[in-house]
C-alpha cells in the first residue's frame, strides 16, 4: 500500500510527438449577461516519421485550449507514406472549405517549400523535400485540413500494385 501513487494519471511517459501551435484566437460567445470570451487554438501534432494530425481546442485560457487542441490532433492522425528521398510518392491535391492545397514531390536537397500551416503540417509529418501551394482561402485551419486531406490521399507503389493485382516490378514496365 505504501508504494501506491497518489494520482497515476499525472505521470506522463516521454513521447516523440511534437506539437506546434498554428494560431491562437480570442473568440466570444454572446450570452444573456454579455460576451463570454474564450480562446481557440489550432495545433498540429506529428512524430516526423509519417504520422500527423490537426486539432482544434477551445477553453477559457490559452494553455487549456492548446492542451485540448493537442488531444484533438492525436485523435485525428493520418499516416503519410514517405519515400527514401524524404518526399512524397506522387503529386496530390486536397480541399478544406474554400482552401485548396497542391503538393508535389521534390528532388533531394530542395527542402520544404510551402507557406503557413501547410508548411507546419508537412514538417511534422516528416516530409523534407516537397513543393506546396495554397490556392483559394488563406484560412490557417482550412489550409491545414486541406493539407491533411491531400496527404491522406497519397498511395505507395505497393498499394497501387496490389490494387492493380500486378507485381510491383511490373508497375513501370509496359
Curated annotation (Swiss-Prot):
Q: Where is the signal peptide?
A: none
User: What sequence ranges are listed for the domain S5 DRBM?
Assistant: 17-80
Q: Which InterPro entries match?
A: Ribosomal_Su5_D2-typ_SF, Ribosomal_uS5, Ribosomal_uS5_bac-type, Ribosomal_uS5_C, Ribosomal_uS5_N, Ribosomal_uS5_N_CS, Ribsml_uS5_D2-typ_fold_subgr
Q: Name one GO molecular function term.
A: structural constituent of ribosome
PROSITE patterns named in the record: RIBOSOMAL_S5 (PS00585), S5_DSRBD (PS50881)
What GO cellular component entries does it have?
Answer: small ribosomal subunit
* Keywords of this entry: Ribonucleoprotein, Ribosomal protein, RNA-binding, rRNA-binding
Oligomeric state and partners?
Part of the 30S ribosomal subunit. Contacts proteins S4 and S8.
What is the purpose of this protein? With S4 and S12 plays an important role in translational accuracy. Located at the back of the 30S subunit body where it stabilizes the conformation of the head with respect to the body.
Q: HAMAP family recorded for this chain?
A: Ribosomal_uS5_B
From the Swiss-Prot or TrEMBL record, give the protein name: Small ribosomal subunit protein uS5
Q: Which organism is it from?
A: Thermosynechococcus vestitus (strain NIES-2133 / IAM M-273 / BP-1)
Upper classification of the source organism reads: Bacteria, Bacillati, Cyanobacteriota, Cyanophyceae, Acaryochloridales
Amino acid at each position: 500500500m505504501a508504494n501506491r501513487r497518489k494520482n497515476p494519471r499525472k505521470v506522463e511517459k516521454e513521447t516523440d510527438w511534437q506539437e506546434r501551435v498554428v494560431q491562437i484566437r480570442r473568440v466570444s460567445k454572446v450570452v444573456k449577461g454579455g460576451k463570454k470570451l474564450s480562446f481557440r487554438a489550432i495545433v498540429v501534432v506529428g512524430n516526423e516519421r509519417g504520422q500527423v494530425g490537426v486539432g482544434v481546442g477551445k477553453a477559457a485560457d490559452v494553455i487549456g485550449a492548446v492542451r485540448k487542441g493537442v488531444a484533438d490532433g492525436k485523435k485525428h492522425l493520418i499516416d503519410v507514406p514517405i519515400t527514401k528521398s524524404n518526399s512524397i510518392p506522387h503529386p496530390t491535391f486536397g480541399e478544406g472549405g474554400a482552401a485548396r492545397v497542391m503538393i508535389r514531390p521534390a528532388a533531394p536537397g530542395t527542402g520544404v517549400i510551402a507557406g503557413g500551416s501547410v508548411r507546419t503540417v508537412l514538417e511534422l509529418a516528416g516530409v523534407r523535400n516537397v513543393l506546396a501551394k495554397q490556392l483559394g482561402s488563406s484560412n490557417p485551419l482550412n489550409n491545414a485540413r486541406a493539407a491533411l486531406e491531400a496527404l491522406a490521399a497519397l498511395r505507395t507503389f505497393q498499394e497501387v500494385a496490389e490494387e492493380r493485382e500486378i507485381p510491383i516490378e511490373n508497375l513501370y514496365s509496359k
